[in-house]
Amino acid sequence: MVSKSFKYPKKHKFEWINETNRVERVGSGLKRVILCPSMELIAILTCSNHLICCRSNSQRIWDVDFHDLEATELCWNHDGNLIVVGFKNGELKIIDSSTGHLVEQRPASRDLAVLMITWAMQETIVNEKRNDFLFDATAYMPLLGTLPSSAKEERIFSSKAIAQFFEPRKREGENNKKVELLSILDERGIRYINMFSSYKIGESDSLKSALNLGVPISHSITNDLAYHVLICKGGTNISLKTLYMPLLKNDLGSIVDIATMSTRMQHLVRYLEEVLNAMYEEFDNVFKSEASFIKTFDALVSKYSDTTFFSLQLELYQFIMNGIPSDLLKEWINERVGDRVLKNWERAMVNSYTSLIIFCQEFVIPACERLTVLLSSARGKSIWGHMKGNTLLDAKLVEDCLATLGYLQNNVFSFLNCLFEEKKYMKHFISWLNYAIVEFNTSEPSSIPPQEIIEHINETVIYIRHSLFRSKLTSYFMGTKPLQLRDPDYYSLKDFANQDDSNSVDDFVSFKTLKESLRDSFNVIFSYPSLTCQKQWLKTGDLVLFEGTDWNVSSLIPKSCNEKNQLFSLFFRKDTPNIFLIISQLMENTMLPVSGCHFGLDYAELLGSSLLDFQPATVLDMKLLNGSSILILGKLKEKCFLCEICLADVPLTFFEHQQKNSYLDAISHLPFIPLNSCLWLHEFEKDFLPSTLEYALSENSDYGVLISRESSRYRLFSF
């Protein structure tokens, strides 16, 4: 160990962000407060299970109530546009930070509370040489439309902020790629690791999984993404554990490629699901419009309970075929329908037909085209990879997914054909019915109908026989026929005019069946590479560092030390003066401690007073700042303070090459060193005594938040 000469405090650089000296209070109590890494936004989780998003001036943007779900953890993504929230029952919700709307909800894979969430972003170099497969045709397609909102369900793609999912990608061929890893941890260890938040590359699906490590209290990832370093509680001690995935190190480009395709296609499949759900809602409006129209006839029939009448459809058919209406039909047309009722029904039907046409032409078909392009690219990659001997995709599974997508497209075109015909025939029917109403109410009926009525009488008959109150469109939504791949009879467009009564819902594959089949086919495509990735995880290190499980940890792998892959870890017990700094380095696929220091804060020396005896300050909380300094929230008697310690001023003791189980003894024998130098120190007034702190290191500024859980108050500061 080499002793160092300490310096007195430098110029004070601590300042409150809120210049009005205002301390914010949350009445229901503070459970968790985190800062956005890219914008000056705060996410607050209250004890009453409310998630509040605020600006740095504490102005509320939105407030979400989770009701009976008990939230346990939350995390921002790097761009600050999404917040992921974990719950006690194991569920996850991803929230749009601009609106507070739900983006995605994921059920719990196991009934354990979410303890930790890390959403890491690394900019890595992917050595991709297959430039022929990097061309992205979807980048030159128009952006997809934003779905209308719904009262029945919360749609992801009703939010304009989520339109970024389908923005054209940057220029292809760039080697630098930003790779995101979303990790969810519970008391057994890592539940799963997703690349780009949705593509699963690791899951603890069995008790023998390498991801089952114990209760995690810290999780760090190396820059090449291949090593995950965790500090866990287990039994009666604290351990340093290393996970290694060779595939991430040796063939990162292939996984990033597949994960990127999977994520984009998953968004498109979800988009299609929401569009089809919207079409079901719109068709429900068609059904309700028809039901309300026919209800006027049924109400009239109920007055004549002693007389037998045909249905409205048959009454109209009999009238148009022989030109003589029954007394009941004449009474219904004269007294119950009228011009106003007919116009309202026509307007409702035309609006629904128009909405369904727009959904098909401007939403479903363009999304299917994009998905076809991506699936074709995936098929090419799988064939190329098979030739090279390192494929992670099965070409046959991709072809099956393309076939399912082809069925959906065929169904949509057939549905559009049917929809256009029914809309046209309905207008002819209404023209004929308007003519009949006029004829019934005139004193001198015309002997010959107008030429327009005569020319379209066949279409009117078809509409009454096959569509009125029993729309052929129903079969596309209520069909019960199972999907059979490579069915040659399915690829012929159904002719609306030639359909007869023998065609029933049993002869149609519904949109719902196709939607579920597409989702299943898509999941099968990427399940094989995902399973391959999950089996690659190896636990290469498990070292006991401390006895007891009441240690708090702050650790990180600084970006400035990426080449060395060093892990800086601070261990402390709350309300005690002891602080341990342990620096570990990756050696032979295992993170091993190489140096450490056991120190405490000499409060008297930190203040620059030589008159006071050594007075060790107790630690309330501390955070590492990118491998260069430490923020320490401390307390001495009634005084509470915050200071920044430079890591260069911390004297280190280097460990000799130890056996794996002897680090515990080496760390426990580190001598205690009083530290009497800091970069700055700030004492707090008695009206606000914080107990914990959070910080965010952004490109523009460094800022943090001090939290007093006892008084449910918080305040932002910069440094």
Curated annotation (Swiss-Prot):
Pfam family, one: ANAPC4
Subunit and partners: The APC/C is composed of at least 13 subunits: apc1, apc2, nuc2, apc4, apc5, cut9, apc8, apc10, apc11, hcn1, apc13, apc14 and apc15. Interacts with apc1 and dim1.
Cellular component aspect of the GO annotation: anaphase-promoting complex; cell division site; cytosol; mitotic spindle pole body; nuclear periphery; nucleus
Annotated protein name in UniProt: Anaphase-promoting complex subunit 4
Keywords assigned by UniProt, alphabetized: Cell cycle, Cell division, Mitosis, Ubl conjugation pathway, WD repeat
Reported function: Component of the anaphase-promoting complex/cyclosome (APC/C), a cell cycle-regulated E3 ubiquitin-protein ligase complex that controls progression through mitosis and the G1 phase of the cell cycle. The APC/C is thought to confer substrate specificity and, in the presence of ubiquitin-conjugating E2 enzymes, it catalyzes the formation of protein-ubiquitin conjugates that are subsequently degraded by the 26S proteasome. Has a role in promoting metaphase to anaphase transition via the ubiquitination of specific mitotic substrates.
Claim: Cell division is one of the keywords in the record: yes
Organism this protein belongs to: Schizosaccharomyces pombe (strain 972 / ATCC 24843) (Fission yeast)
Family matches, as Gene3D superfamilies: YVTN repeat-like/Quinoprotein amine dehydrogenase (2.130.10.10)
SUPFAM superfamilies: WD40 repeat-like
InterPro entries the record matches: APC4, Apc4-like_WD40_dom, Apc4_C_schizosaccharomycetes, APC4_long_dom, WD40/YVTN_repeat-like_dom_sf, WD40_repeat_dom_sf
Biological process annotations from GO: anaphase-promoting complex-dependent catabolic process; cell division; mitotic sister chromatid separation; protein K11-linked ubiquitination
Top-level taxon: Eukaryota
WD repeats: 57-96
